[in-house]
Amino acid sequence: MKDLYIVNCCRTAIGSFGGSLKNTPAADLGGIVVKEVLNRAGMKPEQVDELMFGCILTAGLGQNVARQVSIKAGIPYSVPAYTVGMVCGSGMKSVIEGARSILAGDSDIVVCGGTENMSAAPYALPAARWGARMGNNKMVDTMVNDGLWDVYNNYHMGTTAENINDIWGITRKEQDEFAAASQNKTEAAQAAGRFDDEIVPVPVKVKKDIVEFKKDEFPKAGVTAEGIAKLRGAFPVSPESPNPQVVHTFEVTGAQEAEDKGTQRVTAANASGINDGAAAIILASAEAVEKYGLKPMAKLIGWGQGGVDPKIMGVGPVPASRAAMAKAGVTIDDIDLVEANEAFAAQSIAVARELGFDMSKVNVNGGAISLGHPVGASGARIIVTLIHEMLKRPEAKKGLATLCIGGGMGTAVVVEKC
């Protein structure tokens, strides 16, 4: 395979639901990070051959969010752009598609990434189109319906995490301990400025002033497992609980028995947040790196995708990561750092068991439970965070980024530091 380089990458700080970024459109967030990533790379917009950007909650945003991002970033009209829709994998899928474009010889430089403003997702009134003549009509929350709902089984993503709890025997205590650790790691990382290099300030209006939003606002300080153990379960267990009937697409080796099997164990504290943010990544061929004198951060050496039963969508990273590592010619023992998106503590624990993660290498600065999960951006965000952390660690040579995808899928990439 030809060499594929990640020239530069950055992200916005992540906003809370209804927080600092609620009034900043997704296309604006994307335009800000793309403009900045080109600036950081010392590149001109006209050097870009194509832009691919993930975004899930596109209702009411206008045609082709990626094209809007491209134009807002100052990329010429002559450069095509398209929006990638693979639910939570969209931002990472854009990187995979960018790599394929370069390998196919269609492009030399592709800007990839993702953007999402979950706070701004509108409500829809489907009946209004053809017949809401009188009486009450049902409104649809497009944020939940298009981003967080399993259409195959008609329940929330949180219920798929409860299915994983039942099959893998994951206790409430394990999940709360995992979630508290994520928050504690992020609290320490923010205090040490570990995220500063990867974050691009976003101008936001506060009353009459314009201020820079540049610190993730979702993390909580002083979180303990004992403290969050008081919260109630947030999602109903599936009708099949405590023994959900699923089709396994890989051999399960990490299943255990749990004394609280069949109970509600997923809470607001051990699940990821509902958030806003964007991330951008520049991919380039070896020829483009030489031609323009670019200084890459990392190589993209492998990627993979996989499918699982939608009822247990959270374990999608298992086949995806195995495929990515096989393509890269590495094993989990060769991986120095892992960014595994924390959609739920339940699925994160199951994935770690199945892949044999050394947890001291995983989400060393916390993950989506603490930082948040702007769904269309997260796949790119974890790559950005992974690479920036690798650059801070001389011993970190190779990294794995992976995440689960609603509908029963996963994506993963393997990178090597330059």
Question: What do the predicted segments below correspond to?
Answer:
Residues 160-162, 198, 206, 301-370:
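Active-site pocket-lining segment
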Residues 12-39, 57-59, 82-99, 119, ...:
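Active-site pocket-shaping loop/turn-to-helix segments
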Residues 46-54, 80-85, 110-115, 176-181, ...:
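Beta-strand segments within the central parallel beta-sheet cores of soluble alpha/beta enzyme folds
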Residues 55-110, 152-159, 222, 226-273, ...:
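Conserved catalytic cysteine-centered active-site region
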Residues 1-61, 65-73, 77-80, 160-172, ...:
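Conserved active-site "lid/cap" helical segment
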Residues 109-164:
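Flexible glycine-/small-residue-enriched beta->alpha junction loops
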Residues 10-12, 22-32, 40, 174-286, ...:
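N-terminal extracellular/periplasmic Venus flytrap/periplasmic-binding protein-like
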